[in-house]
Design a protein with these regions (language model features):
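An acidic, low-aromatic, low-complexity terminal/linker signal
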Residues: 1-237, 241-249, 262, 271-309
Length: 309
C-alpha cells in the first residue's frame, strides 16, 4: 500500500519548522526500529525476488513491482538478527531518497508515530558502534524505545558509488585554501566524515562538525554572544534535514529569524530534497538546497554564497 496522504503529515509539520516528524515503526526479530515517513514510498507484503550473483551478502535480490526494478535489502542480515520463522507475513518497506529506490525487508509494521525531534536522543557510541554504528537516534514513544536507523549509511555500504564521492572534488581541478569557516550539521557519522573530508580537499580547511541542529544552534548562539562579527565565526552553514534533537528545517527557521545570524548563507544538503521539501526550505529561508550525494555541486554553492564574505 502507498503511504496515505492523510497519514503523512510530515510535510505540514516541517513547513512551519515545528521540529516534529512522523516515523513508520517496524520490527525485525522483535526489535523495534523506525524510519522517517518522508523516506517511504510504499509498504507491501514481501514477495519473491530474483537473486543477483556476486551481490552484497545482505542483498536478497531484485523485484519489479511496477515499471521499476528495485533492490531488496534484508535488514535482519544487515543487523545480525535472526530471520522470521513465518516469512510469509514479512513486509517490504519501499523507500526513495538520494534519488534512489530500495526495498527493506522487515518482519512487521507497527504503525505511524508522530514524534518530536527533541524526543530522539543521540545513540551511545559505545553501544551502537561509534563511527560504524547503524543508528542515528533512539526515540522514546509511549514508553517504548525505537531505534532510528541510518539508512543512508546502509545504502552507502551496499552501493558505495551512490554515496558522496571524494573523486568529485578532484575533478574540480586545483583549488586554493580558504580561511572561511564552514559549520556542518549532520547526524550520520559516515556522511559527516565524508562531507568534512570533501570540504577539506576543496580548500575549506576550517570546518566545525556538529551532530544535529541543536549543537549547531548552540554554537551559533555562542558565536553571536561573543560580540565579534559573525562572519569571523561562520561563513556558511551546511545542514542535513533529518537530525535528532533539532532538525534542519527548525535550525533554518531559527537562523533566518535572527537579525544577526540570518546573514549567514545556509544550505540544506539532504537525501530528502524533493520538490515539496524544496518549497518548505525556501519558505523557511534556506539560501540553497541540494540533494545528496552531489558534493561537487555543494562546494560550488559554498563558493558562490561566500564570495563576498
Amino acid at each position: 500500500m502507498a503511504i496515505p496522504e492523510s497519514a503523512n503529515k510530515t510535510s505540514i509539520l516541517l513547513e512551519s519548522g515545528t521540529n516534529e516528524l512522523e516515523i513508520i515503526e517496524f520490527t525485525v526479530a522483535d526489535e523495534t526500529f523506525g524510519i522517517n515517513v518522508a523516506k517511504v514510498r510504499e509498504i507491501m507484503v514481501a514477495q519473491a525476488v530474483k537473486p543477483m550473483p556476486n551481490s552484497h551478502h545482505v542483498v536478497e535480490g531484485v523485484f519489479k513491482p511496477r515499471d521499476e526494478i528495485i533492490t531488496v535489502i534484508s535488514l535482519a542480515k544487515y543487523l545480525g538478527l535472526p530471520e522470521c520463522e513465518n516469512s510469509g507475513r514479512d513486509i517490504f518497506v519501499v523507500t526513495h531518497f538520494n534519488n534512489l529506490s530500495f526495498a527493506f525487508h522487515v518482519h512487521t509494521v507497527v504503525g505511524i508515530d508522530r514524534i518530536s525531534w527533541t524526543a530522539i536522543k543521540k545513540p551511545d557510541k559505545a553501544v551502537y558502534g561509534g563511527q560504524d554504528g547503524a543508528a542515528t537516534g533512539i526515540a522514546e514513544f509511549q514508553g517504548r524505545l525505537i531505534t532510528i536507523l541510518d539508512f543512508e549509511k546502509i545504502i552507502a555500504e551496499i552501493s558505495p558509488e551512490s554515496s558522496i564521492q571524494v573523486e568529485a572534488i578532484e575533478k574540480m581541478g586545483e583549488r586554493h585554501t580558504m580561511e572561511k569557516t564552514i559549520l556542518v550539521a549532520e547526524d550520520s557519522m559516515l556522511l559527516s566524515k565524508l562531507i568534512i573530508e570533501c570540504l577539506h580537499k576543496a580548500g575549506y580547511k576550517n570546518t566545525i562538525k556538529t551532530d544535529n541542529g541543536q549543537e549547531a544552534w548552540d554554537y551559533l548562539l555562542e558565536a553571536k554572544e561573543s560580540g565579534d562579527p559573525i562572519k569571523d565565526h561562520v561563513a556558511c552553514i551546511v545542514s542535513d534535514i533529518e537530525m535528532p534533537l533539532m532538525d534542519g528545517h527548525r535550525l533554518t527557521k531559527l537562523v533566518k529569524e535572527d537579525l544577526v545570524l540570518k546573514k549567514i548563507p545556509l544550505i540544506l544538503f539532504s537525501s530528502l530534497i524533493s520538490e515539496e521539501m524544496r518549497i518548505k526550505g525556501k519558505q523557511l529561508g534556506a539560501d540553497e538546497q541540494i540533494s545528496k550525494p552531489e558534493i561537487g555541486k555543494l562546494v560550488s554553492l559554498i563558493d558562490k554564497l561566500t564570495e563576498n564574505h
